[in-house]
């Protein structure tokens, strides 16, 4: 802001021989620099990123001024693939922020893989007969994704002795 600087109170030898004219000066106070940086965050594939308004750091606040929230946005959605996406910070709100020239710095959103569970089925066979290979069950798929191929095998054969044998799935 701009403020007047006033002068007054003339004193000195012979000052009475002058008509003193006072003219104010101007004091300009420039905004202080303030940097607001979006914090890096993580999300999970299939979930809409929940960035909130408090995932930021501020550098340069003075005199008890505060930031209570910042708009944080990203182009990532619940259907965005695993990878990294920018987080944009803007629109800081708080106390005393009119005294600052605010610069915003981006952060990074990392979308991590969702958990996909492939469970091999169970079954029974009789000693001496051909061994069936049970199917499988898939859980954890999101966004209409599908599993089209899973290899299921077991370690038993028609000549295996009675007992429990592992059934393994792979290739999803």
State each model region's role:
Residues 1-172:
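Solvent-exposed beta-strand/loop surfaces, strongest in extracytoplasmic domains of secreted
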């Amino acid at each position: 802001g701009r403020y007047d600087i006033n002068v007054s109170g003339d004193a000195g030898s012979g000052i009475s021989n002058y008509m003193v004219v006072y003219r104010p000066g101007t004091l300009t106070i420039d905004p202080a620099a303030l940097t607001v940086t979006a914090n890096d965050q993580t999300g999970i594939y299939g979930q809409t990123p929940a960035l909130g308004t408090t995932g930021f750091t501020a550098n340069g606040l003075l005199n008890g001024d505060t930031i209570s929230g910042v708009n944080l946005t990203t182009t990532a959605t619940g259907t965005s693939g695993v990878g990294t996406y920018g987080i944009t910070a803007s629109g800081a709100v708080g106390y005393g922020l009119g005294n600052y020239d605010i610069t915003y710095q981006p952060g990074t959103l990392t979308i991590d893989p969702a958990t996909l569970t492939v469970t091999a089925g169970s079954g029974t066979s009789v000693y001496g007969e051909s061994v069936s290979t049970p199917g499988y069950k898939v859980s954890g798929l999101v966004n209409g994704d599908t599993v089209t191929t899973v290899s299921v095998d077991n370690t038993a054969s028609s000549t295996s002795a009675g007992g429990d044998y592992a059934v393994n799935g792979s290739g999803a």
